[in-house]
């Protein structure tokens, strides 16, 4: 029961400058990310969507009430904060008319108002979110938010860590992994079909540096509701047990044995009370 309620701390992936990213290293980082998905990100996402540890507790005996009441404070915290924080879309402007025109066109093409809202919401849920940049099929700059469940940054190990790689991946309908690894110049495709391997030699992504930005909720990369997680679970358990008590007594019958009744039907004495 306790294991279900514990959320693992976030982890920053690093690699030393003298190490290269081969398929063995990539596989290791993906495995670590998948572990983090299970021990942290999935629990935070479940909390926001209203699926709490109480839903996974062992069922009580059939004759006992077994309410599982969820009061979704996590969603309330996230939505309320983001309503105040980014309810009014971000406005970007420039005194240079040509730059202003480009910014407006870039924002409209990439639906930046929606992207920014999703980045903010995901930061509040997971403690961080990524914004990825790419060149689309029309040779224009594309921008897309990436949830931390679907990708991760690998930083160098310097005093002020800088991104060295960005990895995104997904599984197709046949449970085959497909993904992309980006460094400061190239993007490489990989797959685990017939064994983990890179596909081709990679291609220039067209950006100066690793094409991603990490946004964080705070320096610790904690969810907006993470510090209240134990209280939310305790509240859900308390209110559920209270409902169980009410149901238990509502369904109970009073049986009186050995009562002495006079000619008017008034009880004179009771030998045993049994619930």
Model-derived regions: residue spans:
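Extended, helix-rich architectural segments
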Residues: 1-141
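A generic structural signal for short, solvent-exposed coil/turn residues
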Residues: 84, 123-125, 146-147, 159-160, ...
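A general structural signal for short secondary-structure junctions and capping/turn motifs
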Residues: 120-125, 157-159, 170-172, 243-247
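Extended, regular secondary-structure scaffolds
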Residues: 130-221
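Extended, charged amphipathic alpha-helical segments
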Residues: 198-275
């Amino acid at each position: 029961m306790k294991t279900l309620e514990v959320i693992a701390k976030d982890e920053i992936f690093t690699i030393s400058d003298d190490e290269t990213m081969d398929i063995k290293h990539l596989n290791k980082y993906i495995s670590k990310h998948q572990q983090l998905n299970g021990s942290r990100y999935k629990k935070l996402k479940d909390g926001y969507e209203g699926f709490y540890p109480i839903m996974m507790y062992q069922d009580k005996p059939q004759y006992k009430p077994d309410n599982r009441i969820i009061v979704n404070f996590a969603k309330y915290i996230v939505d309320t904060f983001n309503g105040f924080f980014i309810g009014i879309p971000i406005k970007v402007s420039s005194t240079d008319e040509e730059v202003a025109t480009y910014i407006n066109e870039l924002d409209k093409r990439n639906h930046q108002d929606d992207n920014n809202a999703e980045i903010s919401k995901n930061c509040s849920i997971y403690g961080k979110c990524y914004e990825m940049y790419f060149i689309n099929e029309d040779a224009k700059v594309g921008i897309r938010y990436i949830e931390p469940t679907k990708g991760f940054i690998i930083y160098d190990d310097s005093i002020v860590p800088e991104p060295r790689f960005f990895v995104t991946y997904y599984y197709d309908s046949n449970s085959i992994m497909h993904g992309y690894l980006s460094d400061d110049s190239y993007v490489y495709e990989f797959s685990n079909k017939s064994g983990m391997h890179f596909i081709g030699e990679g291609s220039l992504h067209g950006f100066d540096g690793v094409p991603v930005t990490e946004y964080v909720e705070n320096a610790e990369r904690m969810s907006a509701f993470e510090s209240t997680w134990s209280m939310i679970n305790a509240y859900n358990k308390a209110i559920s047990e209270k409902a169980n008590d009410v149901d238990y007594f509502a369904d109970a019958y009073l049986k009186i044995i050995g009562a002495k009744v006079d000619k008017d039907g008034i009880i004179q004495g009771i030998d045993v009370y049994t619930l």
